[in-house]
């Protein structure tokens, strides 16, 4: 038998990219229905027929007042909820009605975000080699990844990965996965989509489940998409952020801190421990592991993209690390204008950061800083840590069309 003409090592080398994975475009989308936080307690208790629960309504109003959220977007309209009263009850069987919404609307909202990212990228859809789709909203077969592939007209040979029921940390997870795909497949262009709709978690209030009410005060709907690829062709592609390293960790002594369970009543949400305290207690270790190899110990000298699980998390992280308030500006802006959109949040923050950096005349997409960190926090407690490197801003760059 004739000897092989190439070695495995040569094949492996040819398969791999040379440079780091890079974010090449970002797109975001929300439902049209906008809910202002100041009006939400009255609306929420009226639509769930809970106005007789006056003390609970006052508690909920205080939650909303402290949330630092100005407005959110929600697919569920008052008209739809009026037609589906079981979704408004605290624990009424309603999974079928919820599923009917999310299996259609999750890929549809994802499509809107993906189209914006593809338009900014400016390359033919046929160049997309991989699709990573993430949602905590509903499960179906074939999944939202398949539906989006059909909706966008992607090649039938696109390599798909569907991630269901990950939770709020997954905006970091999808970037970690996309980094590995882009760097280990020369020429790969990965479309990443996070699409979240609260139709699975919406329900009426209960004195016995106040942590569910916390979710009702915080969560909103949104989708975000990014194009990730290594070795960008800068004649036609515009790098935004490089993905330098990525890791995932389960925090010690945090089991049960955040749980979600899919039941006949929908997705139930449970906060069982001091989540802000657990995250802030472990944040320095995560930062040291990520930035010590780079010789960075001043965390005010990097840009910050942190999942805004709630204002208390951001407050305690700031205090623990000694952050200047300006470091969390992009994060707090997204919390204020959209609420907690689970996995999509950190991608919204990346979008806000690169746009504001250009508008403010900064030298880089990372608010003038070279290095940055992206944190995802969620069920587990699980933390995703992504080290980012910004790129220089040229005239007209870093702002979407």
From Swiss-Prot:
GO process annotations (BP): flavonoid biosynthetic process
Keywords: Acyltransferase, Flavonoid biosynthesis, Transferase
Recorded GO MF terms: naringenin-chalcone synthase activity
Protein name, per record: Chalcone synthase 1
EC number(s) per entry: 2.3.1.74
Gene name as annotated: CHS1
Function, as annotated: The primary product of this enzyme is 4,2',4',6'-tetrahydroxychalcone (also termed naringenin-chalcone or chalcone) which can under specific conditions spontaneously isomerize into naringenin.
Catalysis performed (reactions): (E)-4-coumaroyl-CoA + 3 malonyl-CoA + 3 H(+) = 2',4,4',6'-tetrahydroxychalcone + 3 CO2 + 4 CoA
UniProt pathway: Secondary metabolite biosynthesis; flavonoid biosynthesis
EC main group: transferase
PANTHER family, sorted: CHALCONE SYNTHASE, HYDROXYMETHYLGLUTARYL-COA SYNTHASE
Protein species of origin: Sorghum bicolor
Family that this chain belongs to: Belongs to the thiolase-like superfamily. Chalcone/stilbene synthases family.
Domain of life: Eukaryota
Catalytic residues as annotated in Swiss-Prot or TrEMBL: 168
